[in-house]
């Protein structure tokens, strides 16, 4: 209960413990906070030793009420107070957003400096729905971003310095209790490959230097030091467009250490690409997919339902074609429902009544139906943009669209079988289910003028994915000399579960338990006996090259290569 005290002849009301103040007891607010943190950590240790359930929220609430704290201690403060002897046991209880490293990798998103969209020179304008960029209402933001997304705000605080962005984000994830031994960079902020070569080299060099701590003179030196750093760069993703994903661009991205491309497709209809001012054809998308996959890259496509002049039936047909046509069949997908944002051409159409978004409930139904079509070899990375809702004039109204769509699928008796939903780490976090009987599963399909084999270790009864490998028998679009002739290429090897250091082992975790080696052995067998290849290449992250050396591979250009007997 609140109490009243006399101060300077006036009655002052004291807040109740936990209701905006802190109890006296001769403690300052800072001292009360320190004692509360100490008590929270001590209680967690005691309950852990007694094998009792550690309910962090209940423990925090009790301590805050006891010491009258209006604001609960931050996770980073509690993590810092953990004794070294208890960190391994209690860190999972304190880790913020465990999903961030559930796939075994800490993702670090960085942004290049704001620059104009390259197709303005040919089409005279940007895409009709695209916010951001130097000429927009959000002038200090990069193209297609508003400057208010979490990654954008971190980039602006760092003044778009790549080293500061990377180092500060890695340190932040570490403070939040995540393992940062394996890092994947995602380069966002418009068409990176359209920027001058000098700036691109500066940007990539600083990303690798942020891991190694070395100050490099060029990209080659930065990559060489990054290969031996304690924090490994196991992959790099670059956002690009089909017209900046040709042979010379692909070669340069391989030198950077890039392993995955995110390509803006948006629609499989030529008329929609023209009407929205994309600046490229859908045929160009299919061509660049062929080139990228034959160079070994993983390909993630961006698709946008609810574009102007499409409608529900055409949207569903577009996604059906995307998943079933050999011209597309990307390895990953980001679904970005169309948003109306101030300052875009679409905003003007919306203001005059010439464009209207799907109603929210209908959009949830559409996304649910799209997710039910996803084949088991495709990973759905995102289901909506992370643009803050107050900046959205019309479109998605809630920030948990994936969750709503999955709930709708349950209602309709549908199931999502994409890679992310079935990952062992995600299943463990969301459903507390672990794989029991794991077996090798093989799926073959044609895509982009080549033959794809998707190998995986799965618990087929519980539908849990433990690890995967993407093997491709190269088609006729090979541009890299290292892969010419009778050659197969491993485009991805990934074992899921909470991150374990590259040379480490943890009996309770799936990484480094031998699944990767078994997948590589099967891939080599298929390449030798079925593809009739005399060489197999791997597009390897810079920091994982030592792993492949132990399997008998050698560095040849940007690839790890092994000659098959």
Swiss-Prot record:
Details of cofactor binding: Binds 1 [4Fe-4S] cluster. The cluster is coordinated with 3 cysteines and an exchangeable S-adenosyl-L-methionine.
Binding site for acetyl-CoA: 182, 492-495, 515-517, 548
Keyword vocabulary terms for this entry: 4Fe-4S, Acyltransferase, Auxin signaling pathway, Cytoplasm, Iron, Iron-sulfur, Metal-binding, Nucleus, RNA-binding, S-adenosyl-L-methionine, Transferase, tRNA processing, tRNA-binding
Biological process terms in GO annotation: auxin-activated signaling pathway; cell division; DNA-mediated transformation; organ growth; regulation of auxin mediated signaling pathway; regulation of leaf formation; specification of plant organ axis polarity; tRNA wobble uridine modification
List of residues binding [4Fe-4S] cluster: 117, 127, 130
One Gene Ontology molecular-function label: metal ion binding
Subcellular location: Nucleus; Cytoplasm
Pathway info: tRNA modification; 5-methoxycarbonylmethyl-2-thiouridine-tRNA biosynthesis
Annotated effect of mutating residue 423 to K: In elo3-14; reduced tissue proliferation in the meristem
Positions of region (Disordered): 1-27
Positions of the Radical SAM core domain: 100-390
UniProt cross-references to Pfam families, sorted A to Z: Acetyltransf_1, ELP3_N, Radical_SAM, Radical_SAM_C
Function: Catalytic tRNA acetyltransferase subunit of the elongator complex which is required for multiple tRNA modifications, including mcm5U (5-methoxycarbonylmethyl uridine), mcm5s2U (5-methoxycarbonylmethyl-2-thiouridine), and ncm5U (5-carbamoylmethyl uridine). In the elongator complex, acts as a tRNA uridine(34) acetyltransferase by mediating formation of carboxymethyluridine in the wobble base at position 34 in tRNAs. Promotes organ development by modulating cell division rate. Required for auxin distribution or signaling. Required for meristem cell cycle activation at the time of germination.
Quaternary structure and interacting proteins, as annotated: Component of the elongator complex which consists of ELP1/ELO2, ELP2, ELP3/ELO3, ELP4/ELO1, ELP5, and ELP6. Interacts with IYO.
Family, per entry: Belongs to the ELP3 family.
Name of the protein this chain belongs to: Elongator complex protein 3
UniProt organism field: Arabidopsis thaliana
């Amino acid at each position: 209960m609140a109490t009243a005290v006399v101060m300077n002849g006036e009655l002052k009301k004291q807040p109740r413990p936990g209701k905006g103040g802190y109890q006296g007891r001769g403690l300052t607010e800072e001292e009360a906070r320190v004692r509360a943190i100490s008590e929270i950590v001590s209680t967690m240790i005691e309950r852990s030793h007694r094998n009792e359930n550690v309910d962090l929220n209940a423990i925090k609430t009790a301590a805050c009420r006891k010491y009258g704290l209006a604001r609960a201690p931050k996770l980073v403060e509690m993590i810092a107070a953990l004794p070294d002897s208890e960190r391994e046991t209690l860190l999972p209880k304190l880790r913020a957003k465990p999903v961030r490293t559930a796939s075994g990798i800490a993702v670090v998103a960085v942004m290049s400096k704001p620059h104009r969209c390259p197709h303005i020179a040919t089409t005279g304008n940007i895409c009709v729905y695209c916010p951001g960029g130097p000429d927009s209402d959000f002038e200090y933001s990069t193209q297609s971003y508003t400057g208010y997304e979490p990654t954008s705000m971190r980039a602006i605080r760092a003044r778009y310095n790549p080293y500061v962005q990377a180092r500060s984000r890695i340190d932040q994830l570490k403070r939040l209790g995540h393992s940062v031994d394996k890092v994947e960079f995602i380069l966002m902020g418009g068409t990176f490959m359209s920027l001058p070569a000098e700036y691109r080299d500066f940007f990539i060099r600083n990303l690798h230097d942020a891991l190694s701590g070395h100050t490099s003179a060029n990209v080659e030196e930065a990559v060489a030091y990054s290969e031996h750093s304690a924090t490994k760069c196991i992959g790099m993703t670059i956002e690009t467009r089909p017209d900046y994903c040709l042979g010379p661009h692909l070669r340069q991205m391989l030198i950077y250490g890039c392993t995955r491309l995110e390509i803006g497709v948006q629609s499989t209809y030529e008329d929609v690409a023209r009407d929205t001012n994309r600046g490229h054809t859908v045929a160009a998308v299919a061509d660049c997919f062929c080139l990228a996959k034959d160079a070994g890259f993983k390909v993630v496509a961006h698709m946008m339902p609810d574009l102007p002049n499409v409608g529900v039936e055409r949207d569903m047909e577009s996604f059906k074609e995307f998943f079933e046509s050999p011209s597309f069949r990307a390895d990953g997908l980001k679904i970005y429902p169309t948003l109306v944002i101030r300052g875009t051409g679409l905003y003007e159409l919306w203001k005059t009544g010439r464009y209207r978004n799907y109603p929210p409930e209908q959009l949830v139904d559409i996304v649910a139906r799209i997710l039910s079509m996803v084949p088991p070899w495709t990973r759905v990375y995102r289901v909506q943009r992370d643009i803050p809702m107050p900046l959205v004039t019309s479109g998605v109204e809630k920030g948990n669209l994936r969750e709503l769509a999955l709930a709708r699928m349950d209602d309709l008796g549908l199931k999502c079988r994409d890679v992310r939903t079935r990952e062992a780490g995600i299943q463990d976090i969301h459903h507390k289910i672990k794989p029991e009987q794991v077996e090798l599963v093989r799926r073959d399909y044609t895509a982009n003028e080549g033959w794809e084999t998707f190998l995986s270790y799965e618990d087929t009864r519980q539908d849990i994915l433990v690890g995967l490998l993407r093997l491709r028998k190269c088609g006729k679009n090979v541009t890299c000399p290292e892969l010419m002739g009778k050659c197969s290429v491993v485009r991805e090897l990934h074992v899921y579960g909470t991150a374990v250091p590259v040379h480490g082992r943890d009996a309770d975790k799936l990484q480094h338990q031998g699944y990767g080696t078994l997948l590589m052995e099967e891939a080599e067998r298929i390449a030798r006996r079925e593809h009739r290849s005399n060489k197999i290449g791997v597009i390897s992250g810079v920091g994982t090259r030592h792993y492949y050396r132990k399997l008998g591979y050698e560095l040849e250009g940007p690839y790890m290569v092994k000659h098959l007997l």
